[in-house]
Amino acid sequence: MVRLDLADVVLRRMQEKDIEAVKALIKEGCEGTENRLILHLLTRPLALLLLAILSSILRCVLHSFVLALVIPVFISVIYLKLTIPRSAGILGSCRPYWDYIGSSYHADTEPDLPNPHLGRAKLTTNQEKTRRRKKAKEKEKMNESEQVDEDELKQRAKVAGEVWVADSDGEIVGCVARDGWSRDGVCRVCRLVVQCWYRREGLGRLLVQGLESRTKQKGVCRVYAHVPIPSKVGEAFFRRLGYRLQGETAGIEEEEEDDYEDPEKGWLGYPLTKVFVKDL
């Protein structure tokens, strides 16, 4: 496993040049999740009942037990393979797809998320100069390429949400997505991904805590996090950060009424996510 110095990590908004790297990172993080979600949905009681009924009908038609058993499962898996990736990529979003262009609009003007590890090490003069040159070149490219309708981009940016990336010497090693949900005092974390080489280094914790700190400054008092339902690692991670599963309250009626967030729904209406809550 590669060691990562958190003092060298910059937590900044995703820019247009980062979109392909972020998509690849999310795709990598979804590889195991997608298969576990499919297995979870196929083993629900209603799904098993429907598969059994269809298998019985096909057995009478095809006169083959093996084909009658395999065909319904095969068709269901193909269907879920085609429909789940959109949901597995960014979970819990209020929109059916993620607008990466809208999320990156004017991202370079947004200040970085706080990183408490930055005080341990300072960049050398050469590194600072290189970073300034990169930013200057990026601004020039943006001015040349971003000739899209400004009003349209502003409208898209309002509802597109935010993607914050962990940048280590120009390499995107992690990201966290915040939905563009407009409910007052609430923030929704839709996806947290860390590159496989840098897991267990504290990077995920750094991303989430940095986002919590920024949203708290903006008046947000509650954070919801959507975690894929078969992910035990994700559940343990958010519990360690002080989150609780939605519905786990002290028994106070007012708290239980406020403590509600719709989980992402999948095939036959079964939830794809667990919703975790934290009051800031």
From Swiss-Prot:
It is found in: Membrane. It is a multi-pass membrane protein. PROSITE patterns: GNAT. Its main location: membrane. InterPro entries: Acyl_CoA_acyltransferase, GNAT_dom, NAT_camello-type. PANTHER family: GNAT FAMILY N-ACETYLTRANSFERASE, N-ACETYLTRANSFERASE 14-RELATED. Belongs to the camello family. This is Probable N-acetyltransferase 14. It comes from Danio rerio.
